[in-house]
């Protein structure tokens, strides 16, 4: 681990699910008087602590952790929202003399963190809430039809069932009178200078990773994932809500309805996690350049 000790303004750690990156983040944070900052798009939600593998109090080992479970399950949350939360958090960490240790499996978060993000306009909260309410009550087809009327070019490029992107495009059009496409080419400020950060991508051997995934999903069921999904389903969220797409939700929901056995949930949940990890590994290999240290952990 000695070659990981030379750092400047931040440590960035990414890798597939179940790769051991969260434990590495805690280890390095302890060495550098650091604070761990979540960079996983599912671990921001408050409802699914177990199912999204948010670190437990024991796993945190007394190290400060930020941006975990701070978003209600019903709320929309984007890469831009995460970047704004990070920008608001960093001054406090700097003032406390704490090194930010970013960790998570959402590659787009790291791209935005070090490369900037499209400079989108501010959206009035009332408008945002209205469109999300309409998404639940009216469904994606109605909002897609509305977007087709006001911004047909953008609508043509979207999946008509992608409620989150449809709502986002409508938000911008209604708030500004302009297409979201007008803003997507404008890049906002870089939050972390990639040249002044230690960057690590954890890429375990596939057999090791699969063994961890298989054991982890069973442990999640033992630790209360079923109760979490019950609580989530009780909220009555639309199927296209991001939190509803967390791996394990559909499988456990099927078990609760009597449509799947516990053994089938274990098999299908682990299989879905392995497929997700494979997609992550491919993305990291293709998107993370040689400035990212490859680490088997």
From Swiss-Prot:
This is tRNA dimethylallyltransferase. Substrate binds at residues 17-22. HAMAP family: IPP_trans. NCBIfam families: miaA (TIGR00174). The record marks 106, 128 as: Interaction with substrate tRNA. Catalyzes the transfer of a dimethylallyl group onto the adenine at position 37 in tRNAs that read codons beginning with uridine, leading to the formation of N6-(dimethylallyl)adenosine (i(6)A). Monomer. It comes from the Bacteria. It comes from Rhizobium etli (strain ATCC 51251 / DSM 11541 / JCM 21823 / NBRC 15573 / CFN 42). Its cofactor is Mg(2+). It holds the Pfam family IPPT.
């Amino acid at each position: 681990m000695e070659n990981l000790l030379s750092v400047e303004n931040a440590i960035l750690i990414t890798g597939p699910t179940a790769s051991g990156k969260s434990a590495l983040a805690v280890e390095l944070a302890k060495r550098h008087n650091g604070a761990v900052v979540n960079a996983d798009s599912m671990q921001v939600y408050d409802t699914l602590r177990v199912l999204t593998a948010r670190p437990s109090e024991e796993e945190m080992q007394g190290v400060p952790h930020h941006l975990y479970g701070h978003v209600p399950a019903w709320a929309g949350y984007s890469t831009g929202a995460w970047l704004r939360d990070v920008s608001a958090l960093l001054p406090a960490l700097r003032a406390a003399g704490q090194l930010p240790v970013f960790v998570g499996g959402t590659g787009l978060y790291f791209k935005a963190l070090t490369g900037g993000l499209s400079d989108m306009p501010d959206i009035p909260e009332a408008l945002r809430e209205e469109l999300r309410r309409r998404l639940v009550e009216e469904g994606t087809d109605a909002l897609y039809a509305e977007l087709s009327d006001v911004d047909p070019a953008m609508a043509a490029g979207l999946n008509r069932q992608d409620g989150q992107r449809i709502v986002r495009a409508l938000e911008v059009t209604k708030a500004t009178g302009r297409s979201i496409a007008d803003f997507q080419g404008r890049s906002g400020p870089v939050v972390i200078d990639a040249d002044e950060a230690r960057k690590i991508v954890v890429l375990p051997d596939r057999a090791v990773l699969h063994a961890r995934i298989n054991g982890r999903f069973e442990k999640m069921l033992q630790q209360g994932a079923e109760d979490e999904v019950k609580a989530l389903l009780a909220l009555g969220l639309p199927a296209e809500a991001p939190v509803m797409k967390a791996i394990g939700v559909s499988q456990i929901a099927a078990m609760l309805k009597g449509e799947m056995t516990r053994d089938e949930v274990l098999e299908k949940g682990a299989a879905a996690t392995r497929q997700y990890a494979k997609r992550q590994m491919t993305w990291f290999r293709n998107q993370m350049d040689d400035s990212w240290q490859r680490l088997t952990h």
